[in-house]
Amino acid sequence: FTKEIVNNERGIITEEINMYEDKPGTQLIYGTYNNIFIKDERQYLVSGTVSDVKKITKEDLEICYEAFYHPENMFMIITGNFDPNEAVAIVSEVMSKKEFPKYNKPVLKFKKEPFEVKTKHFERCMNVNIPKVSVGFKVPKNAFKGLKIDERKVRLYFNLYMRVQFGITSYLRDELQSSKVITGGLSMNLLDTEDYYVEVIAVSTEYPDYFIKRVKETFDERDINEEDVIRKVNASVSNLIMYFDDIEGVNSQIQDDVIDFGEYMYNIYDVYKSLNIEDAREVVKRLNKHITTETIIKPLEEK
């Protein structure tokens, strides 16, 4: 690294940050995270702010590089039609010819995120034709404490419930589309943190208040039947079978599992087939413990 390179990169990243600032979709989702979190670093854009970028030094980058780009902090995943032994031999030969400094493993410090939201309701005006709206649900993982269900399955049950209530075939989505409350898609994003599940549901709609009201009511129903569970499990199994035709998708999923759980879920098919209505109801019943935030991006003329 040189000071010249650092200065050049500062300019490039600053331009990117300014571009994000002008994108309503980005501001909707990350604005929601900013409203939900109080201490968790996920409240910030990965790119940081312009003032953050200006403070970065050559020495900061060297420390980050040595901590991040080191074999002790890496894993390799190869998917496709190849000889595993040959692949391992090639990688081992290449790595044996390289020298690396002693690895100073970073100490991970997690800030305890409180069970509250920074902002319950937030509005801003941007260059949009139709208001963009999001509702964020913050569900504490300790709500499921005492259940004899491992954390991976809890997440699957939570995700299954959200698909039943808000997915493509859900009653709510059909209601909102048939009444023209929404005319486009409805996006759902699940964020799994150390202490919380955070689900953000977002749309473009001329009726933000009604949409927010119906989303909250639908989440609070906290009911699920056996037919729903069987239907969603079968859909998940079908998607899993098709998914294995996507080499890059498989690679990405393995990466996610290793990062999230420290290992790949080889038995995901068996896990899906073991999901049942009794456990689903136990998980759904505990969703009464949650808090919400709502974000609305309005057209400029409504300022």
Where are these regions (language model features)?
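Active/ligand-binding-proximal structured segments within catalytic/core domains
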Residues: 9, 16, 32-33, 135, ...
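A common structural junction motif
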Residues: 1, 94-102, 180, 217-226
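M16 family metallopeptidases and their MPP-like homologs
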Residues: 28-48, 75-79, 134-138, 173-222, ...
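Active-site-adjacent, His/Asp/Glu-enriched structural segments that form or flank metal-binding
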Residues: 1-22, 210-213
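Short, low-order "capping/linker" segments at domain edges
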Residues: 16-19, 116-130, 238-254
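An aromatic/glycine/proline-enriched structural segment found at the starts
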Residues: 42-46, 70-71, 75-133, 137-142, ...
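Short amphipathic C-terminal alpha-helix that caps PH/PH-like domains
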Residues: 91-95, 157, 161, 211-220
